[in-house]
Each structure stands twice: as C-alpha cells, then as structure tokens.
C-alpha cells in the first residue's frame, strides 16, 4: 500500500526535521527520536523490524534520487511524501526496499511571474507538568524504612555536634514542610524556537525555477543545549528542445547541535535517570545550597572507581558536546524522447557530507570523575561521499487493446566514508577545552 502526506500537513509542524513532522501521520510507520535533545536523529520502521542485527531503515528517494537520509530538507520545501509499505516497493527498487520506501517530492517552479514567499514563526515551549516526586519528609521516611542501619544519623540525630550546635534535624518529623531541592525545576528550562523560510519561484513554458532558503533555531530544555539548521536549494527545469529537457538541483544544509544528551550512558547514569534519582535533601551533612553545588553527591559515592549520583545541573554545564554537519548535493537528469513512445533518461547525483564532533568533559562531569577527576576530550571528523548514475530506456506503446511498458535500466553507484578521531586525557586544566587536545 501507499500512504501520502501533503505539503500542508508537513509545513504545519515547526520542527527542525521532516522526520519529526512525519511522525504520527502515516499508519503502520513507527518513528522514534534517538535522543531527547534538539537535532537528534530518528529511527523509522516502515514494515516492522525485518532484521535483528542489520539496518532496518527504509530506502529514501528524493526527487527520484536515492539519498542516505532526508534530514537536510526543510519542511517548507516539501511538496509531498509517499511511503511504500508493501511488496510493490520491492518490485520497483529491489532488495534495497525490503524495509519500505520513503519517496519525497520537493517543490519546483511553476509557470508565471516570479513569486516571492516568506513565512516565519516563533514558538515558546515548556514542560506543562513535572513528575510528582518525593519531598524531603517522604524521602527520608522511605530511606529509613528501606535501610535504617545504613542511614542512621544521616538525616536526623538528637543532641548536639562537637561544637555544641544542635543538629538541624532532631527527628524525622522535623522534615515536615521543609522545602527540598526540586531537581526538575533546577535542570529544565522553557525554550524558544524560530523558523524562517524564504522562497522565489516562477518560470515560463520552457524554463521553471525555484530558489529557497530556510533557517531554524531551537534551544534545548537542558541548559547548554540546542540546535540550528540552515538549508538552501536551487532547482531549474529546462526544456531545451521539443524532445530534450533537463532538471538540475543543488542542495545545501548546515546543522549545529549541542548538548549533553539524554539517552547516552544507559542505566543509572542516564541524564534523566540522574534527575529523577537525585536526593531532595542533603540531610545533616549538606544544606540545599551545598547539595546544589556538589558535583558528586558524597553520600552516594560508592568507591574511588565508581559513583552512583552526579549533579545533573553541573553535568549539563561541565560537558561540551557539539556536532557540526555540512552537506552539499547536486542532481542532474536529462530526458530525451527519441521517438514517440521511446524515451531515454540519464541522471546523476553527487553528495558529500562533512562532520565534526567535539566532546569535552570538564571537572564536575561524571566522565572526568571516572578519569581520576581529570578532564578529557575528543574530536572526530568525518567525510561521507556518494555518487550515482542512472540510465533508463523506456518504451511505452498501446497497440489495439494492449498496453506495453518496457524498461531497460542500468545503475552504478559509489559510496565512501572516512573518519579521524583524536582523543586526549589528563588535561591539567579545562579552560581551553579541546583547543588543548594536542
């Protein structure tokens, strides 16, 4: 079967990804974001999970050309999206379509005088409802019920300390009504996003063109996180002669993503897990202010090699994780109607993507703590290149009551990936970050 999504349904979503706008609009298609930070990638399952170990991603076709993903496209540049979910996709694209096909058609020029269009928006977002977690009294009560011997004299104690000062909490009831640390409110923040789109299109019977520019920016819900995307496209359709025409497109995309992330380091060190498991009170040892300022919760420190609880606020501030990606692509197709019913088409595409990822862990991060409380960082650079050439000869003819459609095709493609990783540990100080990597 084939499911279609129109431009109107995609443009209405002010997001930095076409995949995010596509979510929930096609029955039987599951789209999940790999991480909670803005600009994170998406996993899409069109026909369920067809493999336990291999890649289950669908085949992406944009304006007739195969691409690795559609992250570079702007929502405002989409004309339509079709998702092929059954065996019909394999009949067209072969084994590559085993996991389904996502076919995208972008906007092209139309006959008429030049039309300049602009649309922009600003959005404000915040968490409408936080999780209802334990307050200090409920938390202390639970700890004493679970392990009273371990937490004896940790949260309350009768009498005075060595300096003759009465203990702040003499009994469990002293915690009733005490305001604790709300880690959710301290870590999460309201966010703003902006989306701007400018396009020019027009043409005549022989030449049609479109030029578009898009800019999207979003702040993350965590401090020191966010995403911005700049994309542009120029497309021209030219009828050279009565029987010859060509279609050329140039695409550009630049994305910048930053943030510590939410799903990395699974288990108890997951960022969201750290927020939900952090103590609302420091007990007798720490005030709320001291608990907020502690990079590592001393009570939850298990040994010199391991730790159970880090400060999620300081984690977002002490981790620098940025990724920059720049993509260029060019597509060209030439169609020649040799005789009536017999058409030859040759098409080529070239795509190159350069990425640079910088990660630096300052003092106060759990990663630096694991490294003997010394900062460390890494830089990774990558380059992906793909080019493809298609050649098709098609014969369509209707003879009496019979219709014939015969196609002879040939394709050659090339893809390469190069990566370079540099890593250093035991930085004497963290002021320079990865600039001191050498």
Where in the sequence are the language-model features?
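Surface-exposed loop/interface segments of Gram-negative outer-membrane beta-barrel transport/assembly proteins
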Residues: 110-179, 190, 220-225, 231, ...
């Amino acid at each position: 079967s084939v499911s279609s999504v129109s431009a109107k349904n995609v443009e209405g979503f002010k997001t930095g990804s076409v995949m995010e706008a596509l979510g929930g609009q096609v029955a039987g298609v599951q789209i999940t974001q790999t991480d909670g930070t803005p600009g994170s990638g998406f996993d899409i399952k069109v026909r369920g999970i067809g493999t336990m170990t291999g890649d289950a991603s669908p085949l992406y076709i944009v304006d007739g050309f195969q691409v690795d993903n559609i992250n570079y496209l702007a929502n405002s540049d989409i004309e339509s999206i079709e998702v092929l979910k059954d065996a019909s996709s394999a009949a067209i694209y072969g084994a590559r379509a085993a996991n389904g096909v996502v076919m995208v058609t972008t906007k092209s020029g139309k006959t008429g005088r030049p039309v300049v269009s602009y649309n922009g928006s600003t959005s404000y977002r915040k968490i409408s409802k936080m999780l209802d977690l334990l307050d200090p009294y409920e938390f202390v009560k639970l700890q004493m019920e679970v392990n009273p011997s371990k937490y004896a004299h940790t949260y309350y104690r009768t009498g005075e300390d060595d300096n003759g000062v009465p203990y702040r909490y003499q009994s469990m009831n002293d915690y009733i009504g005490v305001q604790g640390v709300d880690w959710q409110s301290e870590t999460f923040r309201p966010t703003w996003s902006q989306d701007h789109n400018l396009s020019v299109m027009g043409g005549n019977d022989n030449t049609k063109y479109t030029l578009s520019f898009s800019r999207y920016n979003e702040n993350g819900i965590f401090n020191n996180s966010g995403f911005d995307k700049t994309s542009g496209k120029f497309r021209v359709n030219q009828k050279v002669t009565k029987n010859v025409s060509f279609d050329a497109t140039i695409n550009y995309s630049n994305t910048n993503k930053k943030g510590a992330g939410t799903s990395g380091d699974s288990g108890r060190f997951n960022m969201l897990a750290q927020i939900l498991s952090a103590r609302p009170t420091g007990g007798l040892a720490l005030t709320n202010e001291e608990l907020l300022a502690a990079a590592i919760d001393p009570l939850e420190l298990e040994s010199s090699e391991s730790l159970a609880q880090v400060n999620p606020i300081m984690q977002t501030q002490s981790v620098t994780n940025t990724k920059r990606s720049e993509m260029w692509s060019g597509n060209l197709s030439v169609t020649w109607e040799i005789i009536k019913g017999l058409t030859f088409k040759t098409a080529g595409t070239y795509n190159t993507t350069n990425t640079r990822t910088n990660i630096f862990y300052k003092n106060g991060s759990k990663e630096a703590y694991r490294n003997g409380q010394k900062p460390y960082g890494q830089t990774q650079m990558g380059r992906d290149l793909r080019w493809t050439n298609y050649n098709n000869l098609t014969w369509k003819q209707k003879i009496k009551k019979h219709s014939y459609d015969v196609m002879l095709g040939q394709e050659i493609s090339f893809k390469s990936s190069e990566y370079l990783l540099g890593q250093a540990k035991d930085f004497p100080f963290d002021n320079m970050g990865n600039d001191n990597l050498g």
